[in-house]
């Protein structure tokens, strides 16, 4: 078990910390239309994964909006995907209200295994 410090307090993390250059484990998450998405769906692309608890929190909202702004200057070979535990329908609603079109949102609502 790994431990980090958060606001001066130890916080125990599940699993192992990633190592630079290590291949990330595959995942299955739900797209806004409820279809499954995994690494294979982004084959040949540079994939930037942004993990947030919920798009409806102020910091996460600001973070994903910023990634959306930055995405405008990236090549077509780059995909930015924000993963949250929000329901896919809530993600679609949030993207519409926030004007987010360059970041794809995927949901980990089924089993919350993505961050483990």
Where are these regions (language model features)?
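Chalcogenol-based redox active-site neighborhoods
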Residues: 1-116
């Amino acid at each position: 078990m790994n431990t980090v410090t958060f606001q001066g307090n130890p916080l125990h993390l599940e699993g192992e910390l990633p190592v630079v250059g290590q291949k990330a484990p595959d995942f299955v998450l739900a797209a806004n239309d409820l279809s499954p998405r995994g690494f294979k769906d982004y084959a040949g692309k540079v994939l930037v994964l942004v993990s947030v608890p919920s798009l409806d929190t102020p910091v996460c909202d600001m973070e994903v909006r910023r990634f959306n702004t930055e995405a405008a200057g990236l090549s077509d070979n780059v995909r930015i995907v924000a993963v949250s535990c929000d329901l896919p329908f809530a993600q679609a609603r949030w993207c519409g209200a926030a004007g987010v079109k360059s970041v794809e949102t995927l949901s980990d609502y089924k089993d919350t295994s993505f961050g483990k």
